[in-house]
Curated annotation (Swiss-Prot):
HEAT repeats: 414-450
Keyword Protein transport on entry: no
Official protein name in the record: Protein kinase domain-containing protein ppk3
Note on domains (UniProt): The protein kinase domain is predicted to be catalytically inactive.
This protein's record includes keyword Transferase: no
Protein kinase domain ranges (all copies): 1-296
Name of a matching Pfam family: PK_Tyr_Ser-Thr
Chief localization: Golgi
Gene3D superfamilies, sorted: Leucine-rich Repeat Variant, Phosphorylase Kinase, domain 1, Transferase(Phosphotransferase) domain 1
Entry superkingdom: Eukaryota
Top-level taxonomy: Eukaryota, Fungi, Dikarya, Ascomycota, Taphrinomycotina
GO molecular function, a single term: protein kinase activity
């Protein structure tokens, strides 16, 4: 028993020292000695890939594996696999790197344009190594990987170094030396100056494999692009003036009009170098992104493009940046880590940036509600939106109200029935009439999601207050909402709480309000009559309101930019006749609207706006009125 306890203790101790949590295995080529697994570093929880090799099973690979590890430690380049850490036991060597997967498993699915981009990165990696007098010596398709952003990177540095003899002595362990390397290199005097062409030769074989599926000798072009084929053949030359180094091949491709001067590679260069300070670069970047989004890998969009666009918003406040941002979000919505890559920076910008940028972001949310990740709906995130309705900007308030109606169904009950309603109550007391109107419309939209214990008192208090609003559309909205939510109330509540608030509107100065109030009172009286006749009540959630009233919020003429909102893709028709509003301050008459001349009165400039309406009514309520309306102002919350 003591022995078993000791063994268990030893295993537990060894396990606690192991620095990685290992997950699923990633298939590699049949000739690979590596085992590749996804995982994470225990200490930091950083996601990673873990390459491991059994030193007991493959003792002949011990020196090569150590060499690969040491080389990776010293190299830092965007096109070379990023080393994180190493762990070595008596039987295994483990190397943790950035998250990668082999390109071989996806090669057949890649377009020629993406393959050319990959060739550009592989050539850049070899050029970097050769400039440092390092020969990779093992370039083949199985030594090329894709990172989490789908960027092509090279690894497998078993032979890398400046020792031609070491490469020749050990190359057969990886691939047959005589089959891969031309006779001239095999028989020539071994020196670094000539041996560096080994990488060029392997690059030529790689190009054949990349486009044609097998590492041939380039005697036939096959699917290799014609402008690449001519230069690629020179990579296989060993003697004479026609031979090319990998760095020379790269320069040929990158010169003006070269085979690496594609729009996609230019876009990648702009993104990788974060060249956004110059207006010319920003315009070029936006144009290329707009035209190439469909061919850019989704991982790259999520890990790189989104980040650059969020950064770009700090400099470029044009709406086309936000449009691109949400186009990208549409492409990668629902993917793993989207909360971190899109949700977190979005919330951060909504907290910190200027009013125009926050307005544009809110407009993007309104027009693309399906892209929002889960963390947008968390209780801790709602404070970002709640603070917007307490800002000094009518634009932000207007947008925030619409966002409330979008996110309400997915909020927790606690946030919905408390924080969101408190925020709407604040807006209903706002000095801007369109905002007060929109708060009522929003309340009607979210009523079905509220708890029953909260819904009735909130609706009664809020609508009673809105029915007294001097702004015609506000009263119209309150009547429409009241009509649509009446089934939440039993007949006694209708008679006692709702009916008395509607009756004064039967003699309203606005003919449209009077007509709507008549419709409401007729329905209420019909319910009361049926109740008195003893008919059974059916108090339940109201049927979905199909009228055009629900399709849009109204807009403030002073708020710019106004959100482009079409919640149900319907036209909005609020039927108001020409109306005169008598003001307490200057007793001037104003035309409110005429349905004969407008099909969308909520957006029509004939509607009263903040600049047109006299707000002195808010200051001139007497103490008695204030006392009576305390409950209405706070909605009883």
């Amino acid at each position: 028993m003591d022995f078993i306890k000791s063994a268990a203790s030893f295993i537990a101790k060894a396990g606690s020292q192991f620095p990685y949590d290992l997950n699923e295995k990633i298939p590699l080529s049949s000739n690979s000695v590596w085992t590749l697994q996804t995982g994470s570093i225990r200490e930091s929880a950083q996601p990673c890939s873990v390459f491991s090799i059994s030193l007991s099973t493959h003792p002949e690979w011990a020196e090569l594996a150590d060499r690969a590890c040491e080389t990776m430690k010293t190299l830092r380049h965007p096109c070379i696999i990023k080393y994180l850490s190493t762990y070595k036991s008596s039987t295994h060597l483990y190397i943790a790197t950035e998250t990668v997967r082999p390109v071989t498993t996806e090669l057949n699915e890649l377009s020629a344009e993406i393959k050319t981009y990959g060739l550009w990165r592989v050539s850049a990696a070899l050029s970097f190594l050769n400039d440092k007098n390092i020969v990779h010596g093992n370039l083949q398709m199985s030594s090329v990987y894709l990172n989490s952003a789908d960027e092509w990177i090279i690894g497998d540095f078993f032979l890398a170094g400046d020792s031609p003899q070491f490469i020749k002595d050990n190359h057969d362990k990886i691939l047959n030396w005589s089959r891969l390397v031309p006779f001239e290199i095999q028989s020539s005097t071994l020196n670094s100056a000539s041996f560096i062409y080994l990488d060029s030769y392997e690059l030529g074989k790689f190009i054949s494999h990349l486009y044609n599926g097998t590492p041939g000798d380039l005697s036939q072009r096959g699917n290799i692009p014609a402008n690449i084929f001519v230069s690629a053949k020179k990579l296989l030359n060993v003697e004479g003036k026609q031979k090319l180094l990998a760095s020379e091949f790269l320069k040929l491709g990158e010169r003006p009009g070269g085979f690496f001067r594609t729009h996609l590679i230019t876009l990648y260069e702009l993104l990788s170098e974060v060249r956004i300070n110059e207006e010319e670069d920003r315009v070029k970047l936006k144009q290329l992104l707009s035209s190439k989004l469909e061919v850019i890998p989704k991982n790259y969009i999520q890990k790189v493009v989104l980040n650059i666009l969020f950064l770009l918003l700090s400099i470029d406040t044009h709406s086309d940046v936000v449009e691109l941002l949400f186009k990208c979000a549409q492409i990668v919505k629902g993917r793993p880590d989207i909360e971190k890559d899109f949700g977190v920076p979005l919330l951060s910008l909504l907290k910190q940036q200027s009013v125009p940028i926050r307005g544009l972001l809110l407009s993007g949310i309104i027009n693309n509600p399906d892209v929002l990740p889960k963390n947008i709906y968390e209780d801790t995130s709602f404070s970002v939106f709640a603070n917007l309705v307490r800002s000094n900007s009518p634009t932000l308030k207007e947008h925030a109200i619409v966002v409330f109606s979008i996110i309400a169904p997915k909020l927790s009950k606690k946030t919905l029935n408390n924080e969101l309603l408190r925020s709407l109550a604040v807006v209903q007391n706002d000095q801007h009439p369109t905002l007060r109107t929109n708060s009522t419309i929003c309340l009607g939209k979210i009523a079905e999601y509220l708890d029953a214990s909260v819904r009735k008192p909130v609706l009664a208090a809020a609508l009673s207050r809105s029915l007294k609003d001097p702004f015609v559309p506000a009263r119209e909205a309150a009547l429409k909402v009241l009509l649509s939510v009446q089934n939440y109330f039993d007949t006694k509540d209708v008679a006692i709480k709702l009916f008395p608030s509607v009756v004064p509107l039967l003699i309203d100065e606005n003919e449209g309000i009077r007509r709507t109030a008549e419709d409401v009172t007729d329905q209420f009286l019909s319910r009361i009559k049926n109740f008195n006749l003893g008919e059974k009540e059916n108090v339940s959630a109201p049927a979905k309101f199909n009228g055009s009233f629900w399709s849009k919020f109204i807009h403030s003429s002073s708020a710019s930019p106004s959100p482009s909102i079409d919640m149900k893709k319907e036209s909005l028709e609020l039927k108001n006749d020409t109306t005169e509003i008598k003001e307490k301050k200057n007793s001037k008459s104003r035309v409110v609207g005429n349905t004969e001349n407008s099909k969308d009165e909520f957006n029509n400039p004939l509607f009263e706006t903040e600049e047109q309406i006299d707000e002195s009514w808010m200051e001139n309520w007497n103490d008695e009125e204030e006392t009576e309306n305390n409950v209405e102002e706070s909605w009883g919350l």
